[in-house]
Amino acid sequence: MKTLALKGLDQSKVELVVQTPNPDPISWANTIRKFNGIGSDIIITYGAPVTLAAIREVDNIPIVFVDVYGPVEAGVTRSMAAPGRNLTGVSSKVPMITLIKAANDIKHIKSLGILYNGREIGSVIQLKEIRRLAAQMGFSVVELNVSSANMLDSALGTLTSSGVDFIYAAESTLVTRSLEKVILRARDHGIPVISHIPEAADKGALVTLEINTYEQGQLAGECVSAILQGKKQGQIPVATPKKVDLVINLKAAKLLDLNVPIQVLNISTKIVK
C-alpha cells in the first residue's frame, strides 16, 4: 500500500480485501472465486500453489504474484521478460548453491535431510536443485515428502534418527507454518536447519538465504500501479528483488556447539546474535 500511495493510489482510491485460505487446493480455489465474485480489478497471490489456482479459476482479471520460486520452472509464466497470460509478479528465486556452500563451510555435509511438499511446485523445484548439488558436491540426501500435518512428526522422527548433518526446510505452506517445531525438534538432536523461508533464521534456523520481503512488496506494488494505469500485465517483466540476505544465526550455532568460520561471516548480510 505504501508503494501505491506514493503513486497517488492511497486507501481513498484503492480498496484492499485480504483473505487467508487454508493450505489446500479447495480453499485456494474458493478464495479466488470469491475475489472474482466481488468484481476485483486485480488479484494478488502469494506463492506458486495459490497463483496456479488463480490461473485456473480466472482469465479476465489481472494477477500479480509474489514469492514464487522459479516462475518459469513452476509453469506460472512463459518467460521472465514476457510472462504472458493475464499475470506478472515477483520471483523469489535465489542461488541454492550459496546457501549449501555456506552451510558446508560451517559443518561438512555428508548427508542432508530435506523436508518438502510434493504437492507444491516451488518445494519440488528446490528439491531438484539440491539433488543436482548433491551429485556435484558428493553428499547424500534423505528426502521426506510432507504433504499433510499428520505426516510431520513421523518425517521429523525419520530425519532426526537418520544421521543427517543438516535439515533443509523447503518452502511450502505446511513447513512454513510448522517451522519453529521443525527447528526445535532438529535442535534437540543436534541438527541445524537451513532454509530459504523468509525470517527462518529469526525463528532459530542456522543459515538462511532469503529475498527481502519488503522489497518484494514494493515491486508488487509497482506491478499493481502499472496495471491500474493501463499497462498490459502479460507484458510487464517478472521482477526479481535485488536485495538477497544471507543470514547467519550465531545464537543457534552456539546452541548446536558449532563454530562459524570468518569467511562465512564475511559474506553474510545479517547476523542473528
Which residues fall in each region the model found?
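Short hydrophobic alpha-helices and adjacent helix-cap/hinge residues
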Residues: 1-273
